[in-house]
């Protein structure tokens, strides 16, 4: 489980192929944000680099609402070929000791960039992308210089002052949203506003329940979303339809169109 070859193959084979397709369609200087688990971030970042991108920075999405996954050893001790008394004694001696999984309270986000043509300035003038918008602010008072730490929940006055974005709620996620890992709208908006201009095109090849599309609509960006799961694709369509902007969503699902990266 902890050294699952399929996970390793995904990043060394499949994810490189995905990143190469994104590299092909991005303009020079275009940005690519990719979320990961802390344990596999290094393999994801290497795959992105191997596809031709430059890793510009790494973001931390900080949160506290998560369940510990460490497992107790009691189940394994009971299966040992020793007496019940020895099992009890061993369990007591290892009380509190669990499998090596601490509570995960952050999600790393790779910030990659397709290499620019000539200089950053010339690339910005030519392609309208390459720089970051430091007019975007963070924190409770919305007055802090943008950083690579983001949180959408109140943690402490010091952290909130510097890094807090708006906390997602049920209305934001949409009715009947069954997606298990809905990204906070505020975090998607932050990353999009930081690196794109109005009327830019944002591509999300794994759009899930549509948070990226909703963020683009509220920020006056165009978007392309791709999703294999038909149920998630419909949730995304519904969320987009609830917005007041007249931008059409085009989500591909397995039953209707063979998904592809443009």
Feature roles, as predicted:
Residues 1-23, 31-34, 39-262:
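Class I S-adenosyl-L-methionine
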């Amino acid at each position: 489980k902890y050294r699952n070859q399929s996970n390793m193959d995904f990043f060394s084979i499949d994810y490189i192929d995905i990143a190469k397709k994104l590299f092909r369609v991005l303009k020079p200087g275009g940005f690519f944000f990719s979320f990961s688990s802390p344990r596999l971030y290094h393999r994801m970042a290497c795959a992105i680099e191997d596809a031709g991108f430059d890793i510009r920075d790494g973001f931390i999405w900080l949160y506290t609402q998560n369940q510990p996954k460490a497992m107790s050893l009691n189940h394994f001790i009971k299966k040992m070929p020793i007496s019940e008394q020895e099992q009890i004694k061993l369990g007591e001696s290892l009380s509190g000791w669990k499998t090596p999984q601490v509570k995960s309270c952050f999600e790393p986000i790779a910030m990659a960039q397709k290499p620019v043509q000539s200089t950053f300035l010339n690339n910005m003038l030519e392609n309208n992308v390459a720089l970051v918008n430091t007019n975007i602010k963070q924190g409770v008072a919305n007055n802090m210089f943008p950083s690579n730490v983001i949180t959408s929940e109140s943690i402490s006055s010091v952290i909130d002052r510097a890094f807090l974005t708006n906390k997602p709620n049920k209305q934001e996620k949409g009715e009947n949203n069954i997606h298990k890992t809905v990204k906070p709208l505020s975090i998607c908006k932050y990353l999009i506003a930081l690196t794109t201009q109005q009327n830019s095109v944002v591509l999300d090849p794994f759009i899930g329940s549509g948070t990226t599309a909703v963020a683009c609509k509220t920020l006056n960006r165009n978007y392309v979303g791709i999703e294999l799961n038909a149920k998630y694709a419909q949730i995304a369509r519904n969320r987009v339809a609830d917005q007041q902007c007249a931008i059409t969503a085009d989500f591909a699902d397995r039953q209707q169109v063979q998904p592809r990266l443009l």
